């Protein structure tokens, strides 16, 4: 919760005047001299009452580990707001308790504060900010704005904790294939985090990256910030997006990435689709690729971004995992699915994905493959049973993803 304490800063102006009555040219010359003295005295008094303000220190908002990072939140601000951002950034980097920035409105400082944390997932040691306004709270008012930073960790522990996080990050990044392109690196991080980090709303520090890199347990905030942190260390553009998500319109966080000239959405939290129960029990899906480099039409079916950031157009679906791997279906064709299932068994595959473009086609597939006997018929045709032999399979399915996965 932000704490706002308003104080009124009163400035006194001391006015000195010299009255010298008279007329005529000779007296006018004398008056001019006295007016000059008056101006000099007033100027000296003004300098005593209003000393020149010290320049508030600023950090370089464009500086990052590899010099290729683009602070998306910073770039979205006005010039005056960017200055506030740099002032706040400097205070955070110096571990200050109170950071002073130029006079501004409450709306400005709220926005700037949010943009700093949108751009910097590495600031794990801060939870929230409380504000103390000195002045009238307007952008052109006298005085300044003080932000009191709230730490979630003892300052003496920040550097050692940071070192632990960086060590884990470097170890994980070292496992990324050396020949991976930008998409390959994003895909690896997406898979790695989803397979090595559990989701638990009760875990400590779940709103920052400590939970991921030190404990491997987190929630959406940790997943999205860890994704941003790792990709940023590899020189890949990635920013944080917040909003709400289905099915209960809950607060959620995900990412926006850039490959070449195009933008895509990534939601590492939803890499596990939470498959429904099947005839064999609850199936745990290894990973869903629905939200790996997806376009807006895919994401907006389940996600609603807030208006904190201006978002670019995201219409390209060149990196749709299921299209790239030939498991995307624009309609349901039972004969086609039947032959794919039999071929999958003959080829000895471990799994077969079926990702559908629309809900109607997906529901037809569920009716045939989950509730019907389509898979059983395919197994009977493709598998040569010996005496007493059985053949088992599992199927997982997600209504939100419109995805079915058969495990042989």
List PLM regions with ranges.
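Secondary-structure boundary elements
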Residues: 157-212
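C-terminal motif of bacterial Sec signal peptides marking the signal peptidase cleavage site
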Residues: 19-22
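Conserved active-site-adjacent core of cysteine acyl-enzyme catalytic domains
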Residues: 156, 204-213, 218, 222-229
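N-terminal accessory/pre-domain segments preceding catalytic cores
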Residues: 24-178, 298-408
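Bacterial N-terminal signal peptides that target proteins for export
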Residues: 1-9
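Hydrophobic/aromatic-rich core segments of domains that either
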Residues: 222-297
């Amino acid at each position: 919760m932000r704490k706002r304490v308003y104080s009124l800063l009163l400035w006194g102006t001391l006015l000195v005047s010299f009255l010298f009555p008279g007329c005529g040219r000779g007296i006018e010359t004398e008056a001019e001299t006295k007016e000059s003295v008056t101006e000099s005295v007033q100027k000296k008094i003004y300098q005593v009452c209003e000393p020149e303000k010290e320049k508030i220190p600023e950090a370089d908002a464009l500086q990052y580990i590899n010099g290729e990072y683009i602070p998306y939140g910073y770039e979205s601000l006005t010039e005056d707001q960017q200055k506030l951002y740099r002032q706040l950034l400097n205070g955070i980097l110096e571990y200050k308790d109170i950071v002073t920035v130029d006079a501004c409105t409450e709306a400005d400082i709220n926005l700037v504060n949010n943009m700093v944390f949108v751009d910097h997932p590495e600031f794990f040691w801060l939870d929230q900010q409380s504000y103390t306004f000195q002045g009238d709270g307007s952008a052109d008012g006298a005085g300044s704005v003080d932000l009191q930073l709230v730490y979630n960790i003892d300052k003496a522990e920040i550097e050692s904790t940071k070192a632990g996080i960086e060590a884990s990050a470097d170890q994980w990044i070292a496992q990324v294939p050396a020949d991976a392109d930008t998409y390959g690196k994003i895909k690896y991080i997406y898979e790695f985090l989803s397979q090595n980090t559990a989701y638990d709303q009760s875990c400590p520090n779940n709103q920052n990256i400590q939970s991921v890199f030190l404990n491997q347990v987190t929630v959406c905030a940790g997943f999205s910030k860890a994704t941003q942190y790792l990709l940023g260390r590899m020189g890949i553009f990635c920013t944080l997006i917040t909003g709400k998500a289905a099915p209960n319109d809950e607060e959620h966080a995900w990412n926006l990435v850039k490959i070449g000239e195009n933008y895509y959405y990534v939601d590492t939290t939803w890499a596990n689709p939470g498959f429904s129960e099947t005839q064999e029990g609850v199936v745990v899906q290894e990973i869903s690729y629905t939200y790996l480099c997806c376009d807006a039409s895919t994401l907006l079916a389940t996600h609603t971004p807030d208006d904190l950031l201006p978002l670019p157009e995201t219409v390209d679906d060149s990196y749709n995992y299921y299209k790239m791997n030939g498991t995307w279906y624009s309609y349901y064709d039972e004969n086609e699915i039947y032959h794919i299932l039999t071929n999958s068994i003959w080829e000895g595959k471990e799994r077969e994905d079926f990702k559908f473009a629309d809900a109607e086609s997906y529901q037809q597939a569920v009716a045939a493959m989950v509730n019907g006997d389509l898979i059983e018929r395919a197994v009977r045709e493709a598998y040569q049973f010996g005496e007493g032999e059985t053949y088992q399979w599992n199927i997982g399915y997600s209504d939100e993803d419109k995805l079915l996965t058969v495990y042989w």
